[in-house]
Amino acid sequence: MNQYQKKIVKGTIYSLLSGLIWGICGILGEYFFTHYQVSSGWITSMRLTLAGSLVLIWSAMQLKSQVLDIWRDKKNYLPFLAYAILGIFSVQYFFYLCVEYSNAATATILQFISPVFILFYNRLVYQKRASKSAIFYVLVAMLGVCLMATKGDLSQLSMTPLALVTGLLSAMGVMFNVILPQPFAKRYGFVPTVGWGMILAGLFSNVLSPVYQLSFTLDIWSILICLIIAFFGTAFAFFISMKAVSLVSPLVVSVISASEPLSSALLSVLFLGLVVDWSLLTAMALIILPMIFLSVEEAKESK
């Protein structure tokens, strides 16, 4: 195994780990919505503000005044703002908004259209044509996500116009979130890039849904869930997701992000009594196999 292939293996592992973390926190988020009736805007503001503050403080402790380097070049202002709003904010906010307008199954399926957007982006911007096998793996993984989210019952989908729009915006947010930050991460480092991105996204989100306007009563469990979602499911997950994109292509990362509904299903089997049937096993296979084959294909291309 050469150096490039080792990078692809590491990138695949990072991608899987970020998906697993998001799956865990997705279950916590659903519990939070159900038991505390919080809005999608509030939970987005909370997690981005807390996570961004933590990452930026950590970055300042490590880099001192260099943490401000991003802002010393005025050419960075507009592209970085685009990353914060079109990427970080959109992928969080529009997913939860889609859940509110429809349900979790519909939101999950629509968000996983992101690999298709990345294929189009690569074609339009880089004139890079995807291989037939890559397109096939993306479609198979999408089928697996659809089967897992609906359990084979398409009547569970709630495809209202608002759900379709917010779901597609969430998918575009995934695309921007894995593509736009890369120049900044390479030049200034992953930690300050993620930290500043979350702070800006959090400020924007607070304009829409101020985090200080509570619609529920804080207790020990709600505080604990907020901290886990913010620090573990947002700061840490975003960081390793960006690290993954530095090692493998954005397309591979977006396909491997299907491990999020996979991890949610596995946790539901272990802790919530979800019954394992043939539709669930088939969905798992349709999700896992494209991840493996797409990573192997990229490893072969790096030889």
Please annotate each region the language model reported.
Residues Q62-A105, L147, A230-V248:
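Specific transmembrane alpha-helical segments of multi-pass solute transporters/efflux pumps
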Residues L48, A149-K151, S222, S257-K303:
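C-terminal-most transmembrane helix of multi-pass membrane proteins
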Residues I27-S39, V67-D69, L97-E100, A149-T160, ...:
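Membrane-interface helix termini and inter-helical loops of multi-pass transporters
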Residues M1-M46, Q156-P183, L203:
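Glycine-/small-residue-enriched transmembrane alpha-helix faces in small-molecule transporters
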Residues W22-G23, Y83-Q92, P115, A149, ...:
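Transmembrane alpha-helical core positions of polytopic small-molecule transporters
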Residues G19, M46, Q92, T106-I113, ...:
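Helix-helix packing/entry segments at the starts of transmembrane helices
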Residues L54, S114-L139, L262-L281:
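C-terminal transmembrane-helix exit sites in multi-pass transporters
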Residues Y36-S90, F117-Y121, M172-L180, V194-Y212, ...:
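Transmembrane alpha-helices of multi-pass small-molecule transport proteins
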